[in-house]
Amino acid sequence: FVFRPRFSYGKTDNTNGQNSYTFSQDPGYTTDELFGTDDLTSLVSEEDIINTVLKNTLKKGDDLTVGGSVLVNRRLGKLGRNITFRGKYNYTNSSSEQFSTSETEYFQKTPEERMEILNRYITTPTKSYDYSARLTYSEPIFTGGFLQFSYNFQYKHSTTDNSTFDMGDNWTIGDGVNESNPGVLNNDLSKSAAYNYYNHQMDVTFRWIREKMRLNAGVSFQPQKSDLSYKKGDLDTTTVRNVFNFTPTFDFRYNFSKTSQLRLRYRGQASQPNMVDLLPISDNTDPLNIQNGNPGLKPTFTNELRAEYNFFNTEKQRGMFSFFRYQNIMNNISDRKVYDPETGGYVTTPENINGNWNLTGMVGTNIALRNKKYTINTFTRANYQNMVSYISEKDL
């Protein structure tokens, strides 16, 4: 019987200042020259200036997490027959406040739309908890052979209530928010969400243990259900998603000797898109970084193969270790950004994309000199990544 409690508390308080200019082409001046002038148009023509942004932000937050885990194992008579229970629970209570002032001048818009002042106060309290229970049973079927059955249930719940307040044009961060200056609630930008996640996982694993060999092969079945209640402006929706994940696993280990070993592993894993990303919504809290949802997103599936080999000669004090990994991701989720030449901002939409894979290999050696008082160590590593993203004349 093992019990491990968990407790953590964190507090944040940071400020950030941003001063940026966006041009349609290279302005031909250094950063110091551009930011040092009182009249930007004296250096660059208005036709080449997209926007100028002056922004200051203060963020405050605190985070409290408590939880624990328990492990109970009991042997049931016959050698190799046992039952194990694992349980976990976590609770998190966090809150954040953001005070921001922003002054953006759009040089390519009409005089009425040219200047945009956004002074805002945003508060985001969040509460979440999750728990899981896993029961595992192992049954010997022949000498060195075992069948292992396990069932795991996991539940997650979280609530977030984001309230955005518009402050006056002359408001500063130092003024704060109080009864005399409460701000005006912006219903179009404020949002709340309640999320529930249910996961049932059934695993069947075959284990074969010999003097020089160990083999684990199995499959995992995961029926999942998620529901999201989301409110933002006039949108009030509840989305329910039911999925079924199938995950194969393979782990083979062979000992050529006590100091030489080969290991091969494979795992496939499916992951689902974020529920908010599946909603047909557009979040323009930041006018220069508009976030869109995409109801057509597909699940992502990752294949990973690993190989390891090492040996060591104790008499000659020489050894080698090597590692190889291949990973490819099907239907990877990537952000597609579309540039708006009038504002200098971006509209971001998550979309599926294929063609992402990577290879990693490494080899290390340890060679002792003749007197064995000195050794020469080498380490070689190679990595290749094939990364695919959306890019064109206007998309980035």
Regions found by a protein language model. Name each.
Residues F1-L396:
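Primarily recognizes Gram-negative and organellar outer-membrane beta-barrels
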